[in-house]
C-alpha cells in the first residue's frame, strides 16, 4: 500500500485534527439529566477568589468526575473524607492564570519587620511511583492565589485543592507575608520538585520550629491518594504550633518578613533576655497591640488575656507580666493549663473573670458569628464565655444546624439566646433562603418557602432544584434546612406524587407519521395504511419552515403522502413542525428562536395558521427542542427570553386557529423543561405531547449526571423506563399542568447498545462507545447504530430467533429487553407493554398516549395497484402518480413529435412546462420499466449499459457511455430530429428532454474533472513548497499511519470542493435560476441527489486505520485516479458518475430526482405567452456542447479546493513536523480586563465570549539542570507554551483567507459538540447539517478542525510528564490527555481470564491502585521467572511474572499498563458484584527485546 502515497506532498497528509461525526446527536432527557456543564464547579475566574462565592457541595463524590484542577474551602473540623456525614464544601475550577493581582490591596498599614533568614523543611514519604507533575499543578494554583493577594492578612489562611487523585492543602499564619510564601517558599518547592525521583506518596513543606507560634507557621501538604484527613490533621498541628516529623526531609534557607513579632520574642522582652534566635535572626522583643489588649479591668473583675494558638500558661503569664505562681492562683481551676483553647479568656489579676458572653439583639434575635475556616464549637464557645452545650442549645432552630460535631465554614450561627438569624448566602443557590440577595422575611418560620424552584420542582437543603428522589426526599434531622447524612434533603415542594387533574372527555390516542421515512432502504408505510381506528389524532411529521417563515413540503415523497394525509378520515389530522434536527441543525435552529420573537411571531403564526386552514386540517403541533436550552452541542446557548417568547407565539397561533387544535411537544427532564413556562402554556393549548421516550440512549455516555447511580452514564438503561416516566409525570403535573392535557409518550422502536460483557445485561452493566458513536449493530432499514424499529425487532424474533440470546420483560423498567448476537442489548415496548401503560396512564388521569411512530411498527406491503415499494417511491419522486382521490392519468408521450410547440429547437417555455406538456414523466416511467425488464433477464452475450439501452429504446445512437468521464466516454448532445421518432417506434419528442438531462449531468461531472485536475492541480503543486517551508521545517515521515487521515480529508472535502462547483453549475440551469419556491425546491433536491452519494463513497473509503485493510484491489481501483492529492476527489466523482448510470434501483431513484420536472433541460425561467415570442432567447448550442470547464468554473473548484486544503493541511503539517498544537481554554471572558496579559505571546480568539489560545508544548517543560547543590536555591522558570511556526501569516490575507481564529474556533466547536471532551470522531458529510455547513465553506464546522482543547493546568501536567516519559507525547490528544503515565506493554492485546469468587479482592480497592499511580512516571524493572506483587491497596494486589527468557533477563511494566488493565477488568469482571479476580498474558519490553509477561489481580 505504501506506493500509493509515496511522493505525495506533505501538505496532503492530513492531521488528526478534523471533524466529528453525527452532528447534533440527541441529548439526555431523563428526569435526573443535567448537562455536562454541571460536572465541574464554576470556574475560579468567574467566581472570584472568595471561597464563599464558589460552588457548594455536600460531599466529595459529586466532584469525583471533574478532571480539572479544583480549589476548595471547608472547615478544618469538617471531615470531608467521611462519606457518611454531611458537609459543606466550596469549590471552583482552576484553569491556570485564574487570579488577578490584588497583592497591593493587602499591603499592611504597619511597617513589616525587617527581613529574616528562616529555614524551610521539605518532607516526604516514599512507597511507590509518585505524581510530582500533579503536585506542581496544585502548587502553582495555590502559589498564584497566595502571591496575588487573595488571602486576608488579618487571619490565618487555610486552602485546599485537588487535581485528579492528588489532594493538597496550604496553611499560612496571619503574621506571614503572602508574597513571601508564594514567590519564595512555593516557587522553590515547584523548582525543586522537578528534580525529585518520582516516588513520593506525600510531599510536605513547613516553616516551623521550637520557638514558632501558630501565627508564624506555614505549611503545605500534598497526597497522592486524593484524601484530606491527613491534611486537616497537619493543619491542626500547625494551628497549635506543632511541627510535623517526616520519614525523609531536607532543608533550605530563605528570607521572609514577619508582620508581627513571635510570642517567643515577646516572652523574651518581658524577661531579662534581650532576644531569641528564630530562623537564624534575632527578633526584637516587642509587645504587639493584639497582645496588650484587655489588660485593663473594671472593679471586681480581673484583667484578662486571650489565649492564642499554641499558647501555654507560661507564655500567657509572660504576656500578663506576672509570675507563673500568680497565674495559677488567678486561674485555679483543676487542670486549667491542659485545657486551654484558642480565643479563651484568662485572668491576669485577682477578681472574677468578666462575662464575655454576647447578649441578644434589641429585636429579640440572637447575637451571631460566622464560622471561620479553623473554628469549632469549642473555640467559639471559649471565645464567648460559653459552653458547647450553650452553642448547641442556641441553634436548635438555626438554618442548617446539624450539631457541634460538624459545623460548616461560613455558617451564620447564634451565640446567644434569641430568634435564629438569616442564613448565609450561597453563591450558586437557586432556591430557598440562601439565594444571593434574598431579603429577611417577616415570618422567619417560612424560610424554606423563599425563592421556590421553577416548575414547582423540589428544593434541596443546598438550594438546588430537581425532581428526583435526590432532591425531593425530606430527611430533616431537627433544625430547618438539615438532612440526614448521605442525603440532600428537601425544603420545599417535596415529594414525587403525580397530581391527578381533570381527565379528558375522551382519552387521546395520538400517532406520529414519519413522512421522511422514504429515505430509508426499507420499512415503508403509506399514510393510508395507518390503522385509523387506533388513533384519535394523527400527527404528520414534519412540514418545512423557511428562514423567512414560509411553509412548504420540499420532499416529493413527503408531499405525496401529505396529499393522501388530507384525505384520511377518522383521527384528527394534525400537521407537525420542528423536531430535533430542525431545532438543532445550524441551518435551521434560528427559525424558532427568531420566529417566536416579538418582531416575527405574528408572521410565523399567521403562515402556519393559513397552511392549516388552506389544507382543511384539524390542527397543528409544534416541536421545538428546546427553548432556552443551555447546552445543545454546536449551538450557542438559548436566551432565557425564549420560553416566554414561545408562550406569546402560541397565544397568537391559538387565537388565529380558534377551535382547531394546537399542541406542543415537551421534554421529560427538568433540565430542559424548566425553559418552558409550561403551566401558562398548558392553559393556552389543547394538549402536550410529553416525550417520555428517549429517556436514555448512546448520548448518555460519559455524563455522570445522565443516569441515576451510574458514575459515567454508560449503563444499560431503558429509554422508556417506567420509574423515570412516573418521575417525569410528577414533574409536569407538579408544575401546574392539568394531567388531562398530558399525552404520555410510548414508542414503536428500541434504543440499543453494544454490551461490555455478554453475561451482564442488568441496569448497572455497561455499554461501549462514546456519546457520538454507538457500537451497536445497525438494522437493515433504520440503518442507525443505537436505534432499531419494532418491525426489525419482531423480524429477529420471528424469523431469526437463533440470533436472540435473551428476551424478557424487565419488571423494574416495565420494558421489553432483547439481547441478540451475544452483545447487542435493546430495550423497547411491545404492544402488550403499551397496553399496560395505557391503562395505568388512564388511571392517573392523563390525557392520552402518543406513539412514535406508526411507520415503525411492522413491515407493510406496497399499496394496492403498486407493484412494489421501490416502484412506488420512484413514481412519487418522478411525479407520475396522482394522490388518491385526484383522478387517474394515462400517458401520451409517444404521440408527440418533434414539431410540437414544446419540443422545438428554440424553447419557448419553462422547463417544467415543456416536461409536462411532452409527458416526459410518462416516458421516463415507461423507459425504466423496459430497462428493468431487460436488466433482470438472462443474456447470452454482453448486456448493454443503462445509458446505451435507454438510447436504444429512444431511437438514439449506439455505443453510448454516459457513466464515464475519461477518454472512452460518449454522452453527446442529441437533437430531437436525430432520434428515431415516428409511428410504431414507441418513442416521442420527450426523448430529447430525457437525453438532454443525461447530457447535462454528464457535462457537469466532466467539467468538474476538467477544473479539478488541470487548474487546481497546477495551483496546489506550485504552492506546496511554500506550505512546507512556512509551517513545517521538518517534513513528515512517509508511513501508512497517514492513510486514515488522508481519507478523512477526502471525505470532508466532498461538499467543499464538489459542493461549491455543483452549486454554481446548478444555478445556471433554467429550472433552478429563479427565486421561486418551486425553483428552490428543485435546486435542493437535485443538489442532495448529486452530492449525497459522493459523500457516502468518500466515507466508505475510510475503512479502518489498519493498513492491512487497504487491500490491493482497493488500492488498484483507487490508484487509477489518484496520482496527486486532487485525485481523491477525481476518483470519488468519477466513481459516482459510474454509479449514477449503472441502472440499479438506487441509481434510478437518484436520476429521477435530478431530471424530474425538467430540472436539467433548457427553457426560460418563466413562461411567456405565445404572442410575446419575440422576447424569447434562442439557446446557444455551442456553449451547451462544451465539457471543458470555463474560467469561472475552474475558479469555483480552485476556491473550494484551496479553502479545504489549506485549512486542513496547515494543522496537519504542524503535527507532521513533530509539534503538538492545541487550544488553551483560558476560562476568561473576552472582555476580561486582564485578558491581554495572557495573550500577548500566543494567538488568541473569542468564541461565545470566552478566550482561547493556540499553543504548542515545544521542547521540555522545565529544561533546567540543577547544579547549584542547594535545595531551594535553584531558580529556574518553567518553559512557556510556544506559538506555532508560520502562525503570523494566518491573518486572512493569504492561504485562501485562513485565519488563526478559524483553527481555534473550529477546534473549540468540535470539542463542545463532543460534550466538552476531546477525541470525537471525524465529521460525517452524509449528515445533512454537516454537509450543508461544509458546502458553505464553513471550516469551523464542528469536527473539521480537531486540535485538542484543555485548560493550561491540564496541558502543563501532561507536558511535564512528557519530560520524563517521552511516549506521553505520542498519546492521542497530547497535551490535553489524562492517560499519560509510563507504558511498556501492549495492553490492548492482553488476554483476560476471570477467576472471581466470594473471596476475591474488592473492586474499589483495585481502583484505588489506579488512583495512586494514574498519570505517573512509575515503572518496575523485574527479573524474569520470579513472581512479584508490585502494586497494593487494601485487599487488592497486582502481580507480575516474566515467562520464558527469550534472551532477556528483565521485564518492564509501567504505571499506565497497570491502570489500563485494572480499568478494563473493573468494567468487565464482577458481574454486578463488588469483587474481581483474574489473570492474563501480554507482551512488554524486556531489556533486550519483547517479553511475555503474565499478570494477575488477586487478594493480598
UniProtKB/Swiss-Prot annotation:
GO terms for molecular function: chitin binding; endochitinase activity. In plants, chitin acts as a microbe-associated molecular pattern (MAMP) that is recognized by lysin motif (LysM)-containing plant cell surface-localized pattern recognition receptors (PRRs) that activate a plethora of downstream immune responses. The LysM (lysin motif) domains are small globular domains involved in binding chitin in eukaryotes. LysM12 contains one LysM domains. The active site is at residue 625. CDD domains: ChtBD1, GH18_zymocin_alpha, LysM. PANTHER family: CHITINASE, V CHITINASE, PUTATIVE (AFU_ORTHOLOGUE AFUA_6G13720)-RELATED. Coiled coil: none annotated. InterPro entries: Chitin-bd_1, Chitinase_II/V-like_cat, Chitinase_insertion_sf, Ecp2-like, Endochitinase-like_sf, Glyco_hydro18_cat, Glyco_hydro_18_chit_AS, Glycoside_hydrolase_SF. One of its GO terms (biological process) is chitin catabolic process. Residues 303-348, 367-415 form the LysM domain. The gene is LysM12. This is Secreted chitinase LysM12. Its EC number is 3.2.1.14. Keywords: Carbohydrate metabolism, Chitin degradation, Chitin-binding, Disulfide bond, Glycoprotein, Glycosidase, Hydrolase, Polysaccharide degradation, Repeat, Secreted, Signal, Virulence. It comes from the Eukaryota. Residues 428-496 form the Chitin-binding type-1 domain. Residues 1169-1193 have a biased composition (Basic and acidic residues). It is an enzyme of class 3 (hydrolase). Disruption phenotype: Leads to a decreased expansion rate of decayed lesion on infected fruits. The keyword RNA-binding does not apply. Residues 1164-1193 are annotated as: Disordered. Residues 1-23 form the signal peptide. It is found in: Secreted. Secreted chitinase involved in the degradation of chitin, a component of the cell walls of fungi and exoskeletal elements of some animals (including worms and arthropods). Involved in pathogenesis via manipulation of host defenses for successful infection. Belongs to the glycosyl hydrolase 18 family. Chitinase class V subfamily.
